[in-house]
Amino acid sequence: MSNQIQELLKLAEKNDADAQYELAEAYRTGSGIPENLSEALRWYRAAAELGLADAQNNLGAMYLSGMGADKNPIESVYWYKKAAELSQMHAQFNLGMLYLFGNGVEKNDTEAAYWLHAAAEQGDLEAICQLGNLYQLGRGVEQNYVAAAELHTSAAIDGHIESLDKLAEYQQSIEEAALSGSVIAALCMAQKYDHGLGTSEDAAQTYAWVQWARLHGTYDEDDNQLEEWESYVTAITSEADIERGKKLLNEMRGRADEMI
């Protein structure tokens, strides 16, 4: 046992939650001490009972997977919820998924959406994607393809493959919503071409969709997002792309008229 581990053990035995957590990590990974999942579980629990959210999350994970103890989804839910209520992002996601599939707790789409939203707000890409799926399907939330598109666009920009696939899956619905006046959908289209999501980057298309949002969109939320995009495309779009964007804008008007 290394000197560092010995010091951690002394502090852990004095109810130092951080030391208990670090000791549990060492036992779980075999870092500086032989791997011992039972001891890892023991020290995670000690830190969890002192209110350390990261320890509560890891304890939930160990009970869910059966590491250091028999699998116990109910106990897993208990500790994930403790951590989630302390705003531990991974616990919020994990708890949301347990509610979604009814693992260790009664299946509840509304609770699933609540906790996935909490994790998504903190930037968890998988939570953003799964929340987008719930909006697409209308599970736990009112079905809203535009909200789904906004979430999947956000995750896809950061490289989430499933979200990129989802955008391709209902591309037509997003475009139709944009042409019908949804500013959010139009900005999703702009981001698609700005970031090259499933297509080539195209500054003219980006410009055209932002202008469409400004000229034809019905915006019932904060205007800041649209203003930021207008400033962005004005600053970076070349004269040639602006001219091409204006032609694309006329084509969009034609497609919108055909939908009436």
Q: In which residue ranges do the predicted regions lie?
A:
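Short helix-capping/linker turns of helical repeat alpha-solenoids
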Residues: 13-16, 29-31, 36, 49-52, ...
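Hydrophobic face of amphipathic alpha-helices that form TPR/SEL1-like repeat modules
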Residues: 22-29, 33, 58-65, 69, ...
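Terminal, low-structured helical/coil segments at or just beyond the last alpha-helical repeat
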Residues: 1-3, 11, 169, 173-180, ...
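The tetratricopeptide repeat
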Residues: 19, 55, 91, 127, ...
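Amphipathic alpha-helical protein-interaction segments enriched in hydrophobic
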Residues: 184-188, 206
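Predominantly extracellular beta-rich ligand-binding scaffolds that present long acidic/polar faces
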Residues: 190, 201-203, 210
